[in-house]
Protein backbone atom coordinates (compact mmCIF):
# COMPACT_ATOMS: atom_id res chain seq x y z
CA UNK A 1 0.00 0.00 0.00
CA UNK A 2 2.63 2.55 -0.99
CA UNK A 3 0.68 5.72 -1.65
CA UNK A 4 3.10 8.40 -0.44
CA UNK A 5 4.59 9.03 -3.88
CA UNK A 6 1.19 8.52 -5.43
CA UNK A 7 -0.42 11.18 -3.22
CA UNK A 8 1.93 13.77 -4.67
CA UNK A 9 1.06 12.62 -8.18
CA UNK A 10 -2.67 12.50 -7.43
CA UNK A 11 -2.63 16.01 -5.99
CA UNK A 12 -0.90 17.40 -9.06
CA UNK A 13 -3.15 15.42 -11.42
CA UNK A 14 -6.38 16.71 -9.86
CA UNK A 15 -5.08 20.27 -9.56
CA UNK A 16 -4.16 20.36 -13.25
CA UNK A 17 -7.34 18.56 -14.33
CA UNK A 18 -9.36 21.26 -12.56
CA UNK A 19 -7.32 23.96 -14.28
CA UNK A 20 -5.95 25.30 -11.01
CA UNK A 21 -2.57 26.91 -10.51
CA UNK A 22 -0.62 26.44 -7.31
CA UNK A 23 -1.49 30.05 -6.54
CA UNK A 24 -5.20 29.12 -6.52
CA UNK A 25 -4.59 27.55 -3.11
CA UNK A 26 -3.33 30.80 -1.56
CA UNK A 27 -6.19 30.93 0.97
CA UNK A 28 -5.11 27.59 2.46
CA UNK A 29 -1.50 27.12 1.40
CA UNK A 30 1.51 28.86 -0.10
CA UNK A 31 2.66 28.11 -3.63
CA UNK A 32 5.96 26.91 -2.15
CA UNK A 33 4.18 24.40 0.11
CA UNK A 34 2.06 23.15 -2.81
CA UNK A 35 5.24 22.62 -4.77
CA UNK A 36 6.84 20.64 -1.95
CA UNK A 37 3.72 18.45 -1.69
CA UNK A 38 3.64 17.81 -5.43
CA UNK A 39 7.35 16.93 -5.43
CA UNK A 40 6.78 14.54 -2.52
CA UNK A 41 9.10 16.44 -0.20
CA UNK A 42 6.42 16.80 2.48
CA UNK A 43 3.17 15.07 3.41
CA UNK A 44 0.07 17.05 4.37
CA UNK A 45 -1.82 16.59 7.61
CA UNK A 46 -5.36 15.28 7.32
CA UNK A 47 -6.66 18.78 8.07
CA UNK A 48 -4.49 20.31 5.34
CA UNK A 49 -5.52 17.59 2.90
CA UNK A 50 -9.18 18.43 3.54
CA UNK A 51 -8.49 22.13 2.90
CA UNK A 52 -6.68 21.38 -0.36
CA UNK A 53 -9.49 19.10 -1.50
CA UNK A 54 -12.03 21.79 -0.70
CA UNK A 55 -10.24 24.13 -3.12
CA UNK A 56 -10.29 21.38 -5.77
CA UNK A 57 -13.94 20.61 -4.97
CA UNK A 58 -13.37 16.90 -4.34
CA UNK A 59 -13.73 14.68 -1.28
CA UNK A 60 -10.41 13.78 0.38
CA UNK A 61 -11.23 10.09 -0.13
CA UNK A 62 -11.40 10.72 -3.87
CA UNK A 63 -7.84 12.02 -3.81
CA UNK A 64 -6.69 9.11 -1.64
CA UNK A 65 -8.44 6.62 -3.92
CA UNK A 66 -6.62 8.12 -6.89
CA UNK A 67 -3.36 7.90 -4.93
CA UNK A 68 -3.85 4.20 -4.18
CA UNK A 69 -5.61 3.05 -7.37
CA UNK A 70 -4.09 5.35 -9.96
CA UNK A 71 -5.98 5.56 -13.24
CA UNK A 72 -7.35 2.01 -12.97
CA UNK A 73 -11.14 1.90 -12.54
CA UNK A 74 -10.81 -1.79 -11.60
CA UNK A 75 -8.35 -1.00 -8.81
CA UNK A 76 -10.59 1.83 -7.60
CA UNK A 77 -13.60 -0.52 -7.50
CA UNK A 78 -11.59 -3.15 -5.60
CA UNK A 79 -10.31 -0.56 -3.14
CA UNK A 80 -13.76 0.89 -2.49
CA UNK A 81 -15.19 -2.61 -2.00
CA UNK A 82 -12.42 -3.34 0.50
CA UNK A 83 -13.16 -0.11 2.37
CA UNK A 84 -16.87 -1.02 2.51
CA UNK A 85 -16.08 -4.50 3.89
CA UNK A 86 -13.70 -3.08 6.50
CA UNK A 87 -16.21 -0.43 7.62
CA UNK A 88 -18.88 -3.11 8.01
CA UNK A 89 -16.48 -5.30 10.00
CA UNK A 90 -15.53 -2.43 12.31
CA UNK A 91 -19.20 -1.62 12.90
CA UNK A 92 -19.95 -5.26 13.77
CA UNK A 93 -16.96 -5.46 16.10
CA UNK A 94 -17.96 -2.19 17.76
CA UNK A 95 -21.53 -3.42 18.25
CA UNK A 96 -20.31 -6.76 19.63
CA UNK A 97 -18.06 -4.97 22.13
CA UNK A 98 -20.86 -2.81 23.54
CA UNK A 99 -21.95 -3.88 27.03
CA UNK A 100 -25.48 -5.29 27.16
CA UNK A 101 -27.86 -3.67 29.64
Question: Would you name each region that the model predicts?
Answer:
Residues 1-17:
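A short, Lys/Arg-rich alpha-helix, primarily the initiator
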Residues 29, 38, 48, 67:
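DNA major-groove recognition helix of helix-turn-helix
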Residues 18-36:
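Short alpha-helical DNA-recognition segment
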Residues 50-74:
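A contiguous, mid-protein "functional segment" used to position or interact
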Residues 65-101:
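Short, charged recognition helix plus adjacent turn
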Residues 10, 19-21, 45-48, 59:
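Residues that mark the N-terminal boundary/hinge immediately upstream of a DNA-recognition element
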Amino acid sequence: MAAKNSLAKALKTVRKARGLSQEAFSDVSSRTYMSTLERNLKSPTLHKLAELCEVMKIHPLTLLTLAYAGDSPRKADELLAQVRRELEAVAKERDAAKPRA
